[in-house]
Amino acid sequence: MYSSKKLKAYFLRLLTNTKTTKFDIKNARNILFLRYDRIGDMVITTPVFRELKREYPEINISVLASKVNQTILDNNPYVDKVYINFKNNLLRDLPTLLKLRNKKYDVCVEFDHSVIPHSIARLRIIKPKKIISVIKEGRYGVKGDELKLYDCFTDKPKDAHFRDIWLDTLRPFGVAPKSNEYDLYITDKQEEFANTYLKQYYPKCLIGINLEGAVKGKRIQFVELE
């Protein structure tokens, strides 16, 4: 009789057991990035879009974002299209995922460094030619490199900042990043709104900014805000 862990491992292997498509990643022209999580994660991923677009200006870059972090990409000249994903509601996302499948993406880049079943399910539906991800720790006794769904894993050095770990996903494209600075494109209207909002509290209240991330490797340095 199968234990629960063995049963989950069996279905994980089954879900990720796909055939390899012959395609050179360096010839990709239509790329989808999966980044449907927190605001901070999107902020420290913005260098990836810029460095890829600078190397390949003709490439079409789409991002599957969350409702929470999508506004980080407002006015970003390096992102061509943003789609919204609800993460915990696969059925609600299905129309969008099928639309993405019809786009016939050359490459999908998934940034999770763990094995995430809902990400795998979305990738199976989207069905790109190639999938790039960060090296995975494995799950249910299944090693990350056993997951045949992924065509290319990039490294995750122990003490590296996640910004640089995610920039390394551009290596299969032959891109050597020249900068890891973040991109936030604030309009005059947004700046005016922020100033008006803050004035109602200043100087009565002291306003602080939390630079910490969920993990050490996602912390934003103070000098990076200047």
Predicted region positions:
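Catalytic machinery of carbohydrate-active enzymes
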Residues: M1-E226
